[in-house]
């Protein structure tokens, strides 16, 4: 397996953790269903915003630096969600990329409402023309993207509060549209916002 940890350098440390869980408590990519709501935790685009500022040698706030260099895995939230959601993935490569993994594995498509993307106000102010692109395509956020029946929405919001995590509904799973795509208001995301 070749991934994001394959870089040129003098030292590479790879850690693998294995464990067991009851089958009904495993968060999978393969079990999203049409009509499920799509949710994300936290805010999106912070990692991409921080990287852009660092590359431009501009001042970066402590909040963005912390989000970029010290991402926090959403373990507590994942535990809270395990009996509520139909599918789940962490957002490491960007929302569209990672949600596409769910769509492909579950043989469904997704429709996103970009106006609901939870992008932090700081990122919106710093990048007024790019914040939606950062939220859709920026990586290194390590938030969770998950799907669930609408009947579970209140329980999911409560699970977010118990784990101190903001939860935002951002779209809906639909039947596969020929190829398993992530769509924006009925159009291919890549036709609307370049990433």
Task: Label each residue range with its predicted role.
Residues 26, 77, 155-159:
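Hydrophobic side chains in well-ordered alpha-helices
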Residues 2-53, 172:
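Glycine-rich anion-binding loops of enzyme active sites
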Residues 36-42, 70-95:
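Internal active-site segments that recognize and position negatively charged phosphoryl groups
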Residues 37, 43, 50-53, 80-83, ...:
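Alpha-helical scaffold segments in soluble metabolic enzymes
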């Amino acid at each position: 397996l070749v991934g994001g940890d394959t870089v040129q350098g003098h030292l590479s440390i790879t850690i693998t953790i294995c464990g067991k869980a009851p089958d009904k408590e495993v968060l999978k990519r393969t079990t999203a269903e049409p009509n499920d709501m799509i949710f994300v935790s936290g805010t999106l685009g912070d990692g991409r915003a921080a990287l852009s500022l660092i590359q431009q040698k501009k001042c970066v706030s402590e909040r963005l630096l912390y989000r970029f260099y010290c991402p926090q895995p959403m373990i507590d939230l994942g535990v809270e969600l395990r009996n509520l959601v139909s599918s789940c993935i962490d957002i490491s490569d960007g929302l569209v990329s990672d949600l596409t993994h769910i769509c492909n594995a579950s043989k469904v498509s997704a429709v996103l409402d970009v106006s609901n993307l939870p992008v932090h106000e700081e990122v919106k102010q710093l990048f007024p023309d790019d914040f939606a692109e950062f939220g859709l395509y920026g990586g290194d956020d390590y938030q969770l993207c998950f799907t669930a029946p609408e009947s579970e929405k209140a329980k999911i919001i409560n699970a977010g509060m118990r784990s101190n995590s903001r939860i935002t509904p951002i779209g809906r799973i639909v039947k596969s549209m020929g190829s398993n795509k992530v769509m924006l208001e009925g159009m291919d995301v890549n036709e609307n916002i370049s990433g």
